[in-house]
């Protein structure tokens, strides 16, 4: 029902994350199974994983299933990729070394893109070797479906992918500028994606829309607390129970040596954020009271009436982003609460922004 309403409301795409046990929010661990159902319940809505955790997948299986989904949907597949974390790799019986994890991600991505865009696959690498392997299934979209990368604008732009940022509005304008500058530097000024699209960049927004600010905040607050708990506590408890010291402390936040450091970008283009703008963004329409904007795991939640959400949307549009990612169901929000929020957003807010950032939905 939610998926069908997203389509009828005019959303561009639906993005589905990949999470696995012991995470509590691992209720759709097989994205392709779920998205196959989506392909049959919709006719226009685009969809895709955001992201496939590539080190956990065999590239041939991904090539085949991506091709199946693109054909089942009539060419509506979008592909998000990422390396995930070494904790997930460990629980899946893989190496817990971050450099090995990164190398596996890079090679899997190379094989997948090669296989999707050629009739025959040839590859010789550290983890996989294929010689003159026929690619019997090919995606409808050439050379392959649109590509997305999450969290790191540097990696997205350098590799010619659309970008989705996880965080809050503070500093997002700097991320947008960084992405556009790097795209121009590495892809070329005015260069489109491999599919001929304008590169998109958006921010995940956890939304609750209600008739009044007070009602929205009342709904959002307990749901947000549950969401923050679900994100990290079960995995942390499992790590502590097993005595996995390599995943504790600073080591849990290490990045591969050859990867752009997304933490450094917090200070990039800081001149764009004047004191006045920062203060205004810290309290747009009183939204900081809605379960704590930006609190917990780098995420933020926006809760309010349609008029309050419109105020937030004005600031979002002003960042220069051209994609808006809305998450309507998270934490302990019920289906009824989610549908009401989605309905208000679709009828009271979206009509004002149909020529602004393209709307997408993420779960």
Locate predicted features.
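Alpha-helix-loop-beta-strand connector modules within alpha/beta enzyme cores
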Residues: 25-49, 104, 342-358
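Active-site mouth loops of central-metabolism enzymes
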Residues: 52-60, 141-151, 207-210, 295-307
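Glycine-rich, proline-tolerant flexible connector loops at the mouths of alpha/beta enzymes
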Residues: 13-34, 38, 53, 85, ...
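Conserved, mostly hydrophobic/aromatic
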Residues: 6, 18, 38, 69, ...
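An alpha-helical appendage that flanks or caps ligand/catalytic pockets
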Residues: 99-135, 172-318, 356-363
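Internal, glycine-rich beta/alpha segment that forms the wall or movable "lid"
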Residues: 58-161, 166-177, 181-197
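N-terminal beta1-alpha1-beta2 module of alpha/beta enzyme domains
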Residues: 1-41, 45-47, 142-145, 363
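Structural preference for beta-strand elements that scaffold enzyme active sites
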Residues: 13, 44-51, 76-80, 146-148, ...
């Amino acid at each position: 029902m939610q998926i069908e309403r997203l389509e009828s409301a005019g959303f561009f795409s639906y993005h589905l994350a990949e999470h696995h046990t012991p995470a509590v929010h691992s209720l759709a661990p097989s994205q392709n199974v779920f998205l196959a159902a989506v392909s049959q319940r919709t006719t226009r809505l685009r969809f895709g994983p955001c992201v496939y955790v590539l080190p956990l997948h065999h590239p041939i299986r991904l090539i085949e299933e991506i091709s199946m989904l693109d054909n089942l949907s009539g060419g509506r597949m979008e592909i998000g990729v990422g390396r995930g974390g070494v904790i997930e790799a460990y629980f899946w019986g893989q190496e817990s070394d971050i450099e090995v994890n990164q190398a596996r991600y890079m090679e899997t991505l190379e094989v997948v893109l090669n296989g999707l865009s050629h009739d025959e696959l040839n590859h010789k690498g550290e983890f996989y070797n294929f010689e003159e392997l026929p690619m019997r299934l090919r995606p409808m979209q050439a050379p392959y479906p649109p590509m997305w990368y999450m969290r790191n604008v540097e990696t997205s732009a350098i590799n010619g992918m659309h970008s989705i940022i996880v965080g809050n509005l503070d500093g997002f304008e700097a991320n947008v500028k960084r992405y556009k500058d790097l795209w121009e530097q590495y892809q070329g000024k005015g260069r489109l994606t491999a599919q001929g699209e304008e590169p998109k960049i958006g921010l995940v927004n956890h939304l609750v829309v209600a008739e009044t600010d007070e009602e929205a905040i009342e709904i959002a607050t307990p749901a947000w607390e549950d969401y923050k708990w679900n994100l990290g506590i079960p995995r942390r408890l499992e790590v502590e129970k097993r005595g996995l010291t390599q995943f504790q402390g600073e080591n849990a936040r290490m990045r591969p040596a050859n990867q752009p450091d997304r933490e450094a970008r917090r200070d990039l283009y800081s001149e764009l954020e004047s004191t006045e703008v920062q203060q205004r963004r810290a309290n747009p329409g009183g939204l900081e009271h809605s379960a704590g904007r930006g609190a917990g795991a780098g995420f933020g939640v926006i809760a309010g009436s349609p008029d309050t959400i419109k105020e937030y949307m004005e600031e979002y549009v002003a960042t220069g982003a051209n994609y808006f990612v809305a998450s309507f169901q998270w934490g302990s929000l019920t289906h009824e609460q989610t549908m009401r929020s989605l309905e208000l957003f679709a009828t009271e807010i979206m009509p004002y922004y149909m020529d602004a950032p393209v709307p997408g939905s993420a779960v």
